[in-house]
Structures are given as C-alpha cells and as structure tokens.
Amino acid sequence: HMLIMGPPGSGKTMIARRLPTILPPLSPKESLEVTSIYSISGRLGKDAGLITERPFLSPHHTISPQALCGGGKVPRPGLLSLGHRGVLFLDELPEFKRQTLDLLRQPMEDKEIRIARSSGFFTYPADVMVVGAMNPCPCGYYPDRNKCRCTPFEIRRYLSNISGPVLDRIDICVEASRVELSQLKMKKGGESSQSMRRRVMAARRGQEERYAGTPIRFTADLE
C-alpha cells in the first residue's frame, strides 16, 4: 500500500494511474479470480471473456461503506473486492469520511473482506493495492509560507482524518514535489513503463525464488 503526498500539480494522480502499467500482467489464476468476482457482481458482459488487465478503481470521496466493502440484501462485492489483484486509488484521501477510511483496516491487513448478515458471514477476496493521494494541508501548499495560509490547527485537523491504524498499514510513503513549467519544457529521456515493468517482474521472480517451498510468496506477505 502506498501514500503519495504533495502540492497540487505535482503529479500524484498521474503516478497512481501509471501503476497498473508497471505491475506484472495477471497470471491465469489471478485472471480467473478477477473475472469470477466481476461475474458474481453482475459487471461482466454476457459474451465477455477472461479479464486480463489489472483493475484500477478510483471512487469519489463520498462513496458509501456498502459500495466500498460490499453488502446488500443479497451480498455483492464492493470496490475493495472489485479491485482484487489491482489498484484502488483514493484521491484527496483526507476528504473521505474517517469512518469510511477505517473500514480499510481489515482488508488491507487480511487481503479479504468479511460481511456479516443475518443469514451468515460472506467472505470476498480483497488483495488490492490501496494507493492514497493527499495534499500536505487544506490549501495544498504547506510548507511554502508564501502560498500557504493554513493555521497549525487547520493542518492538524486535516491530517487527523486519517487514523493511525490506517497509516500503520501503509508500506510506502512518497513525497511528490511541484514541478516548475521550465522543468516540464526541458526534454529529458525518462524510463518507460515497459522498462519499469521488466524490473518489477525481475524483483518479483527473485522473491518467489527466495520464498519457494513456504506459504509466503512475497515480502509483503510477511506478518
């Protein structure tokens, strides 16, 4: 799981949207899992085949708990399960209701979500990469005091909407800096998504070899 913090225009959303392009392709087993979830949720077309691309979902900050986690009279998967094996991007993270964000705690830890109903318990897979993006303060320009007019109290209140237990489950925190127009105009060769994906896949193979013969596949699975 990852949190990207930076001022407006620093590329937070672009970074998040590029993640599926550098992640390894879905394996046949993963593809079947994702397709099954979309099938039982009624989101798979009649003649649709297997889903072969990793899901990327970006809900609005007003999303309801049921839409996020799943539920209903006849329980259906929510976005946490529909994003299984993919990315769930929460833009403007502190704008989400704190109660909604706290619902992420169990699935971020257990990679599945359990829904209790009078008829019993329902468990859906939710092995999704949760990626949050946020400004450092309500106006977005802290610590630049030439632009930021937020008081210390306003900044603390803004940041406190994300609880400690949710932050504890974030593996990587990235600080994105604002890029000046003059820098954008400079033509520099960057690394392509294909090149990054090859490096990610090489690292993944290394972890699979390291944990061969154990129930663990990747370092992220360690308790």
What role is predicted for each listed range?
Residues 10-12, 25, 61-62, 74, ...:
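Short flexible coil/turn linkers enriched for glycine and charged/polar residues
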Residues 85, 91-93, 103:
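Walker B catalytic acidic pair
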Residues 7-8, 46-51, 212-221:
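Short coil/turn segments at secondary-structure boundaries
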Residues 75, 98-103, 107-223:
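Basic, amphipathic alpha-helical bundle interface domains used for macromolecular binding and assembly
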Residues 6, 70, 92:
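The Walker A (P-loop) glycine that initiates the GxxxxGKT/S ATP-binding motif of P-loop NTPases
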Residues 2-46, 110:
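Walker A/P-loop
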